[in-house]
């Protein structure tokens, strides 16, 4: 899907809290196809439009990696068809129950009932890739410090 190239994989973990000393060398190579696409024949990519799932860290313009072979279960983020279009939502409901709801994390969108036939599950989102250097809704844009001359 992405070609056969590999990228450098640092041997150290990156701290999300307090920084820790890091090694200055590369331990291995990582193939993003293997890391992001466990089942290539059932994996699809879709670009996100809108911010209804921003509460789940899924932003406008993000790239979703979707696996159609996985069983959707409550709590997972899924892609569904609704009104002739694809939507991304969190599946809510009881496990093993034929009914459920597709819920956005923005608190504004109306939940969609699966039982009423309004929507059909299409696949399970396994990764969301987003660009960190672009502005994020609700946050001030990244600004470089002014040079002191």
What residue spans do the PLM features occupy?
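Short, positionally conserved secondary-structure boundary motifs
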Residues: 1-54, 74, 85-86, 97-99, ...
